[in-house]
Amino acid sequence: MYTLVQNQNFLDDIQLQKADGSTETLHISLVITPDIIKRYRQLQVKLMALEKERKSGLNEETVAKVGAAVVDVFNLLFGENNTQKLLEFYKNDFTQMVTELFPYIQGEIVPRFQQAAKARKQAFKKRRF
């Protein structure tokens, strides 16, 4: 029997607790496809290049590029609506936002990307002619 495997879904919730004590829950739903993994990797490479550029000399243009790249990562992984809510929650404080959210991305989402890539690689090995 030939088996087709559906793409993995990443489902999670992030709760935002505001200064006034109120909370808002962001529902994260990400279908992990090879294209999503590829686009995330491209954004990672872009962020690393911008970090090198930033270290060689801080200027407003580089800071703006880093901010835009961070927003691109969040749009890809969390969706535009959730990214907008995150920007509002952090009041556009990119440093705090990155400090708090990148460990979540690295600890929760990236391992799922790695699992999907590994499963895909194993599936290709089985299907070789």
What are these regions (language model features)?
Residues 1-58:
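Short N-terminal mixed-charge amphipathic segments
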Residues 77:
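Conserved catalytic core of Hanks-type protein kinase domains
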Residues 80-129:
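C-terminal charged interaction modules
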